[in-house]
Amino acid sequence: FVMIPYLDRAPSRKGKVRTVFVPYYLDGHDPLFGMSYYDLLIGMDVTVFPSYYEPWGYTPLESCAFHVPTITTSLAGYGEWAARQKEQGGVVVIDRNDSNFGEVTERIADALFRFSHLNAEETEKARKAAAAVAKKADWKHFFKYYREAYSIALTKAAARNLNPQKTTKRNTK
């Protein structure tokens, strides 16, 4: 996007929306907020995580779990998963690839514009939709996949141990 520290210094920035650049780990001990990430998160109206690559992407999920609608991309595993869910309004997933930087920027701006114009009832509906999507990502639903992956890994490791001479560089990774 743009150099975040300089975004709000632009002369054309006279609207109500402000970007805050915080170069700290939000553990409650920073000199700017003195609050944890989660305490700050619950006060937000919407979050934006325009990931270029994240295998899963916990930050958009955390936002949703705290009833904060979020904007993410198709290059985050969570975004890809959330796009397949039925709930609408709590998560905006923007298709992102190597060549659509301008389009991604415009779509994020459009989504923020739409969120900023929601009335109280629509905002509450978006918050509930975000929370509903987060509940679907609970470990009680995903743990079976973890166990399945773990079982596959153990089976492959056992096969390598039984046949060490057949182990190649390719299947040891």
Where do the PLM segments sit?
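Catalytic binding pocket for nucleotide-activated donors in carbohydrate/polymer assembly enzymes
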Residues: V46, P50-K128, A132-K136
